């Protein structure tokens, strides 16, 4: 089984080799899908300070709109969701080419969460719009969903979750070391790990609120709730004991836990939503009701998905390289 993991990793490495980017100091693109890693790999992103500097709860950072005057046909153009008003008013008029817009790094849903979505979508210069947290109103043919990915940016800005401040590269090295020693999914406990109850969002808009999901699953013998908070690396290690992780919606539709768990080799259980197309071909179980989590279904889902992690195409879909290449391919038509 470990040999299969190695072949899968090698295949992903070949895909990424075509997307190596210049070194950016301590803030570089990652291997695994990460919102700011995607930003760094796009052709235009407002500059490193704009990509790196935003922190939650603050007014949107501004970018220099002149940086977008050099956009060419087929380019990928990234901006933060919170900066879309400035992009629409100041950057879009300076662009003379057909491009793809890439947005993320906030909990906004798109297109419902941005009043200027229709104006942006009507622009003949916009070929496609790839965004995190694509909501149910996103039926426009130019809109495509994009993963929220992992969270390397929080700890890069300072200590968090029992972890000292660390660069994205250092965090990913820690993750890779754990992946190298973790058991394959087929050899794990055939139960569901849950830790979402430690982060209950007060302003949750989409899906069941987390306290409600916790109450619904609390008496389920197949769901193992984490009893105490752990340092992030310890939590990651604990997750690798289980075949499944349950991942309800967060403040936004998507959740870092979903993608983090896939990288850790967990089959992820999510609620049906507008994000379902993101999970095609991945070991993700989509349920209509959390009560579907029972022993017979877990046995069936385990038999169906446990071997998926050894497939190169599954490992590839967890990387920035895959999503960058996919966006370029779809834009080219």
Locations of the language-model features?
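Nucleotide-sugar donor-binding catalytic core of glycosyltransferases
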Residues: 10-252, 271-275, 279-286, 297-333
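Conserved donor-binding/catalytic loop of nucleotide-activated donor transferases
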Residues: 240-241, 262-265
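C-terminal accessory segments of extracellular proteins
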Residues: 289-290
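Boundary detector for helix-to-coil junctions that initiate low-complexity/charged tails
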Residues: 1-3
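GIY-YIG nuclease catalytic motif and its immediate N-terminal context
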Residues: 294
């Amino acid at each position: 089984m470990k040999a299969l993991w190695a072949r899968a990793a090698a295949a992903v490495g070949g895909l990424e080799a075509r997307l190596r980017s210049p070194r950016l100091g301590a803030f570089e693109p990652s291997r695994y899908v990460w919102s700011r890693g995607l930003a760094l790999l796009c052709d235009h992103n407002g500059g490193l300070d704009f990509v790196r500097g935003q922190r939650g709860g603050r007014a949107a950072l501004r970018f220099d709109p002149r940086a977008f005057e050099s956009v060419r046909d087929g380019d990928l153009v990234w901006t933060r969701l919170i900066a879309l008003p400035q992009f629409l008013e100041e950057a879009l008029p300076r662009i003379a080419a057909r491009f793809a817009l890439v947005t993320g790094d906030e909990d906004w849903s798109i297109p419902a969460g941005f009043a200027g979505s229709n104006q942006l979508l009507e622009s003949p210069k916009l070929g496609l719009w790839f965004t995190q947290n694509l909501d149910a109103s996103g039926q426009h043919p130019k809109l495509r969903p994009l993963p929220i990915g992992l969270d390397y940016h929080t700890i890069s800005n300072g200590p968090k979750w029992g972890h000292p401040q660390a660069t994205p590269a250092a965090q990913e090295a820690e993750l890779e070391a754990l992946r190298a020693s973790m058991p394959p999914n087929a050899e794990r406990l055939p139960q569901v790990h849950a830790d979402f109850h430690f982060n209950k969002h007060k302003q949750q808009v989409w899906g069941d609120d987390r306290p409600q999901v916790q109450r619904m699953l609390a008496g389920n013998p197949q769901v193992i709730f984490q009893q105490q908070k752990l340092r992030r690396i310890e939590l990651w290690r604990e997750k690798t004991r289980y075949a499944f992780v349950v991942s309800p919606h967060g403040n936004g539709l998507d959740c870092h836990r979903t993608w983090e768990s896939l990288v850790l080799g967990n089959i992820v259980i999510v609620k049906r939503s507008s994000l379902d197309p993101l999970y095609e071909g991945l070991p993700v179980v989509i349920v209509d009701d959390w009560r579907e989590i029972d022993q017979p279904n877990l046995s069936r889902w385990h038999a169906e998905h446990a071997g998926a992690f050894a497939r190169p195409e599954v490992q590839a879909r967890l990387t920035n390289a895959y999503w960058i290449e996919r966006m370029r391919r779809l834009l080219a038509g």
